[in-house]
């Protein structure tokens, strides 16, 4: 019989819902308003790439928009690990707890809060042993969030599945010129089909401005950005960058922002 409602889409383009494989819906790195923003732009399925898991689950009843959402819990000092060299037992505890509470897996935030190379390698293998999805913002205490960090991550994956986050983050000209870095990144991805990735189109770099008790910036990526624009990597540098408009503070709800 006839439909209850007919929507005339003459002249429009219809397509399936978009799958966004890298979003941030938690208060630490994104905003609880993220689900609504995604839905308004045609996204129906997404992968949150850091959590915090409990924060997103708590806010979903109020801020959710009916999206299919998978969440990776962040595996990172000084938050879910106390140091940058956690034991394997600590890794197993975090991974198992995250999976039991609803996470799809874990993500290493190496570019921001690096672990040692050895620990990073062990964490990836441990996550896979526990049948957890594992992603990595490339970077360790030996190599940062750049092309060298990406090369290191590909080598550490050693043929095993790994989601290497936002590939263009490693092609900003820190080691070679941007075109050569992008060419190398594409060659690495083509040569290593076990690695899957994505890229973003925003000209801005979203990161945290928080400082530790010593006044030093906590995120290595934020430090890189401050240094690039000639600011010190501390609370004073953040203030000056904000005053000069080199850094913008984007707020979600109270106590939420990046």
Spell out what each predicted region is.
Residues 9, 18, 31-113, 125-132, ...:
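Divalent-metal coordination cores built from histidine and acidic residues
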Residues 58-60, 82-84, 117-125, 144-157:
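Distinct, well-ordered alpha-helical segments
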Residues 74, 135-139, 159-165:
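Acidic, His- and aromatic-enriched active-site or binding-groove loops in soluble protein domains
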Residues 129-130, 160, 191-193:
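Helix C-cap/helix->beta junction micro-motif
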């Amino acid at each position: 019989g006839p439909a209850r409602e007919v929507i005339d889409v003459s002249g429009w383009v219809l397509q399936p819902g978009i799958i966004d494989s890298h979003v941030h819906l938690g208060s630490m790195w994104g905003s609880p308003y993220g689900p609504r923003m995604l839905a308004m732009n045609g996204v129906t399925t997404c992968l949150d790439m850091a959590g915090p898991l409990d924060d997103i689950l708590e806010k979903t009843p109020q801020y959710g928009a009916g999206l299919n959402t998978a969440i990776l819990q962040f595996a990172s000092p000084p938050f879910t690990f106390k140091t940058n060299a956690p034991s394997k037992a600590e890794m197993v505890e975090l991974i198992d707890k995250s999976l039991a509470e609803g996470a799809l897996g874990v993500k290493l935030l190496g570019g921001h809060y690096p672990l040692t190379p050895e620990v990073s390698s062990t964490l990836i293998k441990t996550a896979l042993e526990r049948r957890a999805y594992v992603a990595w913002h490339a970077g360790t205490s030996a190599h940062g969030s750049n092309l060298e960090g990406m090369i290191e991550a590909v080598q550490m994956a050693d043929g095993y599945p790994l989601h290497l986050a936002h590939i263009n983050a490693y092609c900003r000209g820190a080691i070679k010129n941007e075109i050569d870095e992008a060419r190398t990144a594409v060659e690495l991805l083509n040569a290593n089909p076990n690695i899957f990735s994505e890229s973003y189109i925003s000209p801005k770099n979203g990161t945290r401005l928080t400082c530790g008790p010593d006044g030093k910036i906590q995120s290595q990526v934020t430090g890189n950005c401050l240094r690039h624009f000639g600011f010190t990597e501390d609370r004073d540098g953040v203030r000056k960058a904000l005053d000069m408009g080199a850094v913008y503070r984007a707020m979600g709800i109270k106590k939420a922002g990046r």
